[in-house]
Design a protein with these regions (language model features):
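Helix-start/capping segments and mature chain N-termini
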Residues: 1-72, 81-85, 103, 108-295
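Ordered, amphipathic secondary-structure segments that act as subunit-interaction surfaces
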Residues: 92-102
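Conserved acidic
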Residues: 75
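Short helix-capping segments at alpha-helix termini
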Residues: 91-92, 240
Length: 295
């Protein structure tokens, strides 16, 4: 397997060798998952000029996660300077993912939080014709439903459960993805014990039904607000399309006019089968939703 282009930059140190150690053995982000992160899309032109899509929105969401966890967040200008330095060094054309990572820091020494940025190449451009590229990655997936193990209101009035917070503790998400692969599917749609759909391990949920675009609400469900879903719904409203957030029964997923898992890095990816059942896949509708998302 060829090496994937990857960059690491640490607050207070700048860009470092990607193989250089950047956290200590007692960093609470490593030992307890006590930290948060956010991810954004990076698009780099054929000449090596890189830009981050909606960086400020992702920094705001990171800040909200840090506040919910009582972690001191570096000033925005420090994050911007670190990202700018990373982008100035990054030159691999195509799509990449920027991660903003923040941990509580060392357990046995008062040294403040650990903050770093990574950029990892994902492949060719996802937007048709973008910067001379063409859509090369598959834009459809298969999925299975898996229970998240709690009801749809489990996070209401319980801020210590960290609902809606993008923590570093993603082990359940990765375990669910492995289970999907064991079942012959690409991805997962989490469900509640009272029969509603939530989101994916690394994505928001969007469906088209009765002429409207619908997504799962945050709050009591505990799901993370999807910035890309929000952008799609805003663009759809501007286009005269009805949108809403509401609890969606799992049974409604199988009869939807379209079903997508949505993330900032991949955009809206159309789900073609769910639990082995073929779904409706309107390509014109899928193209419209992709356009709403900027893909």
């Amino acid at each position: 397997m060829s090496e994937v282009p990857h960059l690491v930059a640490v607050l207070g140190r700048g860009v470092v060798d990607a193989d250089e150690p950047v956290v200590t053995a007692d960093d609470l982000g490593l030992t307890r998952g006590d930290g948060c992160f956010d991810s954004a899309r990076v698009v780099t032109s054929a000449t090596g000029s890189a830009r981050v899509v909606d960086l400020d929105d992702h920094l705001q969401r990171l800040g909200a996660s840090a506040r919910a966890m009582d972690i001191t967040n570096p000033p925005l200008d420090a994050w911007h300077a670190l990202v700018d330095e990373a982008l100035a060094t990054w030159s691999t054309p195509g799509e990449a993912v920027l991660k903003l990572l923040l941990t509580r820091g060392r357990e046995w020494r008062s040294a403040g939080p650990t903050a770093l940025v990574t950029i990892t190449h994902r492949g060719p451009w996802l937007t048709p014709g973008d910067l001379g590229g063409a859509a090369a990655a598959p834009r459809t997936i298969t999925a299975v439903t898996l229970s998240r193990g709690h009801p749809s209101d489990a996070f209401a009035d319980a801020p210590w459960l960290l609902g809606g917070v993008k923590t570093l503790s993603y082990v359940v998400n990765t375990a669910a993805t492995r289970e999907a692969r064991r079942r012959g599917a690409d991805d997962v749609i989490f469900t509640t014990t009272d029969g509603y759909a939530l989101d994916g391990p690394t994505s928001g949920l969007l469906l088209a039904t009765d002429g409207a675009l619908v997504s799962t609400p945050t709050g009591g469900t505990g799901i993370l607000e999807s910035l890309t879903v929000a952008a799609i719904l805003e663009a759809a409203r501007t286009d005269g399309v009805a949108t809403r957030y509401e609890l969606v029964p799992v049974t409604d997923l199988y009869t939807a006019d379209g079903l997508w898992l949505v993330s900032s890095g991949r955009g809206p990816v159309l789900v073609t089968t769910l639990d082995g059942r073929a779904l409706r896949t309107d390509q014109q509708l899928a193209a419209t939703v992709a356009r709403y998302a900027g893909f």
